[in-house]
Amino acid sequence: YIRGIKWIGNSVYPTDQLQRMFGVKAGDTYDKKTINKRLGYGKEDNPEDMSIKSLYQNNGYLMSQIEPAEIIIGADSIDMEMKIFEGKQFSINNVGISGNLRVNDEVIRRELYTLPGELYNRALLMQTIRQLAGMGHFDQEKIMPDIKPVSNELVDINWPLEEQASDQFNVAGGWGSGTFV
């Protein structure tokens, strides 16, 4: 079981807030899968993600990292140290769009939640992916932003889009009682 949890390196968020959000506490059974999920390791595209990593990334801390360390105490218990490297807050510098041949840039830009001058926000990035997929003009499986830091505090986001055929032509016919419909 977990004997204790210590947070190291957090200055942006207080320890009690991180502990509350983490949800694993002293006395709980050690479960690596749950711990990794609550820290934010694993599936990255979950829009409902309420992990510690998302907390930081939704507030501009793109390069934040959390390294859990397990210290074995006796035969049946461990202490955990959560080493947090917060880094600097990143703002969005430029937002580019490429690969769109039929859809006007302005139509696409209306769907973007990632705007120049705003703090990087992972949740808004995921919302933008859903909005672009909902347009029906682009291959949903290939909508993935290209995120490139351009300085210690600025990031460029490019949306390389691949259009899919959205034009349809349907012909239907039938017959009955000697007439053609």
Residue ranges of model-derived segments:
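Periplasmic polypeptide-binding modules associated with outer-membrane biogenesis and secretion
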Residues: 1-179
